């Protein structure tokens, strides 16, 4: 029984560390790429014309980035910005999804 709890604790610790690392990379890329200047700190936009991304589904965020990257979804600013996120879509999406948002 003791071994079970030790294994459970170790597994939980590793999972939390990996999640924190992914969120940390996602947050760093979100800021470095300039996403924060429009979509706001933690994905909470203060401009009613720019969507907040905090708390959105990971797969939805990734799909939107891919649509902007391919040009399937049109927005001059996002069509220029989204390609810079290539390779970091999942970490950015996981970071944004982990942020809580209240209207």
Model-derived features with residue positions:
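Sec-dependent signal peptide recognition
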Residues: 2-10
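Electrostatic cytochrome c docking/interface patches
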Residues: 13-31, 41-49, 67, 100-101
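Short pre-active-site segment immediately N-terminal to redox-active cysteine/selenocysteine motifs
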Residues: 31-34, 42, 57, 88
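The canonical Cys-X-X-Cys-His
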Residues: 34-41, 92, 96
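Axial heme c-ligation environment in periplasmic c-type cytochrome domains
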Residues: 46-54, 69-103
